C-alpha cells in the first residue's frame, strides 16, 4: 500500500490520517445533504491539488452556472484567475450544452453518456488533465432523463478508470432515512472511495463534519471530524 502514488487533499488533519492522500486514479464520491458544502470541499480538493502540485483538472458543473461558481469560490479565497492555476483548471457548464441541444430539438435523441465520455476523452488527449470533479450525478440524470442510470453510472466510472482520471462525483444522500450514498444505490460500491459530509445541529448551532467511509488501498481513520474553512490558508481543516 505504501508505494501508491497519492493526491493530497490539502485538508489539514486529513492527509496525515490517510497515508498522504487519495490514491491516483481512484473514483470517489463526495456525499451529503444540501448545504453540507460538498461543492466547496470538492472544489478545494481540485484547486489545491493544482495550486501545490504538477497537475490539472476539470470541474463539470450542472448545479450552478460557471460565473456563479467562480464568484462563490473566489469569495472563499480560491481565485481561478490566479496565474498559478488559471490555465490548469477548466470549468465546464453542461447545462449550456442542454440549452443548445434543446434549441436544435436534439436533447431527447442524444446518447448523453456517450457524448460526455467522448468530451472527457477529447479533453484528456488535448490538455492532458488528470483530475475530474462532477457536480453532480443526480443533476446529470435529472437533466438527461436517462432510462438506466445504474448502467450509465457503471459506464461513466469505467470510462474514468480507462482514462486514468482521479475523479470526484458529488452525490446527495437519499433513501427514507437519508443514509444511502447517492440516488441510485450503486454509487458507493462502484466507487473506490466515499467521503461523507454531515450537518449536526446542537441547539441553534450547526456543525459540519467529514468522514471517510471507504478508501480502497488506504489505511484511514474511521469516524467523523468537524470541518472548517480557513480563508487565510485557503483550505479546510478537520479537528
Residue ranges of predicted features:
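P-loop NTPase motor core
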Residues: 28, 107-189
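Conserved inter-motif catalytic segment of the P-loop NTP-binding fold
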Residues: 55-138
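Amphipathic alpha-helical transducer elements in NTP-driven molecular machines
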Residues: 7-11, 15, 24, 63-70, ...
Amino acid at each position: 500500500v505504501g508505494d501508491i502514488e497519492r493526491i493530497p487533499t490539502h485538508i489539514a488533519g486529513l492527509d496525515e490520517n490517510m497515508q498522504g492522500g487519495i490514491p491516483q486514479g481512484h473514483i470517489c464520491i463526495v456525499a451529503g445533504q444540501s448545504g453540507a458544502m460538498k461543492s466547496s470541499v470538492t472544489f478545494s480538493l481540485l484547486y489545491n491539488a493544482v495550486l501545490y502540485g504538477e497537475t490539472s483538472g476539470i470541474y463539470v458543473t450542472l448545479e450552478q452556472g460557471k460565473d456563479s461558481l467562480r464568484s462563490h469560490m473566489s469569495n472563499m479565497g480560491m481565485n481561478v484567475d490566479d496565474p498559478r492555476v488559471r490555465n490548469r483548471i477548466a470549468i465546464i457548464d453542461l447545462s449550456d450544452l442542454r440549452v443548445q441541444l434543446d434549441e436544435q430539438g436534439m436533447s431527447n435523441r442524444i446518447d448523453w453518456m456517450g457524448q460526455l465520455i467522448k468530451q472527457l476523452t477529447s479533453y484528456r488527449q488535448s490538455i492532458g488533465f488528470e483530475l475530474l470533479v462532477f457536480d453532480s450525478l443526480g443533476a446529470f440524470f435529472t437533466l438527461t432523463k436517462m432510462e438506466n442510470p445504474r448502467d450509465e453510472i457503471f459506464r461513466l466510472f469505467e470510462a474514468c478508470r480507462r482514462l486514468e482520471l482521479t475523479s470526484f462525483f458529488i452525490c446527495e444522500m437519499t433513501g427514507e432515512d437519508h443514509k444511502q450514498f447517492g440516488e441510485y444505490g450503486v454509487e458507493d460500491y462502484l466507487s473506490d472511495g466515499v467521503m461523507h459530509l454531515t450537518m449536526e445541529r446542537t441547539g441553534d448551532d450547526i456543525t459540519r463534519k467529514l468522514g471517510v467511509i471507504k478508501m480502497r488501498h488506504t489505511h484511514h481513520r474511521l469516524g467523523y471530524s468537524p470541518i472548517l474553512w480557513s480563508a487565510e490558508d485557503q483550505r479546510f481543516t478537520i479537528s
